[in-house]
C-alpha cells in the first residue's frame, strides 16, 4: 500500500498553478529601476527645488483650485491673534511717545 505522503503528492501537483507569465516591463525592470523611475527628480537643476516627482505631487496646490485661500485665512488668523495679544499686553509707554 502507498504511503499517505505519496498519495498526496499528485493532488498537490494538480493544485499548484504555474507561475503567471512575466510581462515585458517586469522582465526589463527590477525593484531598483522602479525606485529610480518613481523618485528621480522630475526636471533639471534649479527648476524642481531638489524635489522628486513624488514629493512634488504630494506637496502641490494643484488639486485645490483655491490653494491661495489657505494663505489668506492664515493672514486673517494671525491678525486676530496679534489684536488679542495687544489687548492683553499693551505696549509700555516710553518718554519718547
Curated annotation (Swiss-Prot):
Full protein name: Nuclear protein 2
Purpose: Acts as a transcriptional repressor by inhibiting gene expression at the NUPR1 promoter in a p53/TP53-dependent manner in cancer cells. Involved in the G1 cell cycle arrest, and in a decrease in cell viability and cell proliferation. Plays a role as a negative regulator of the protumoral factor NUPR1.
Family listed: Belongs to the NUPR family.
Species per Swiss-Prot/TrEMBL record: Homo sapiens
Keywords: Cell cycle, Growth arrest, Nucleus, Repressor, Transcription, Transcription regulation
Biased composition annotated in UniProt, kind: Basic residues: 80-97
UniProt xrefs under Pfam families: Phospho_p8
Main location: nucleus
GO-annotated biological processes: cellular response to starvation; DNA damage response; negative regulation of cell cycle; negative regulation of cell population proliferation; negative regulation of transcription by RNA polymerase II; regulation of cell cycle; regulation of transcription by RNA polymerase II
Region (Disordered): 76-97
GO cellular component: nucleus
Stated induction or repression of this protein's expression: Up-regulated by p53/TP53 in cancer cells. Up-regulated by DNA damage stimulus or starvation.
Compartment(s) of residence: Nucleus
Amino acid at each position: 500500500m502507498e504511503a499517505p505522503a505519496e498519495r498526496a503528492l499528485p493532488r498537490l501537483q494538480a493544485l499548484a498553478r504555474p507561475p503567471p507569465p512575466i510581462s515585458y516591463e517586469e522582465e526589463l525592470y527590477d525593484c531598483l529601476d522602479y525606485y529610480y523611475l518613481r523618485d528621480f527628480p522630475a526636471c533639471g537643476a534649479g527648476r524642481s527645488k531638489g524635489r522628486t516627482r513624488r514629493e512634488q505631487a504630494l506637496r502641490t496646490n494643484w488639486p485645490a483650485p483655491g490653494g491661495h485661500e489657505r494663505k489668506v485665512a492664515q493672514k486673517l488668523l494671525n491678525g486676530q491673534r496679534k489684536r488679542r495679544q495687544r489687548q492683553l499686553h499693551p505696549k509700555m509707554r516710553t518718554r519718547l511717545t
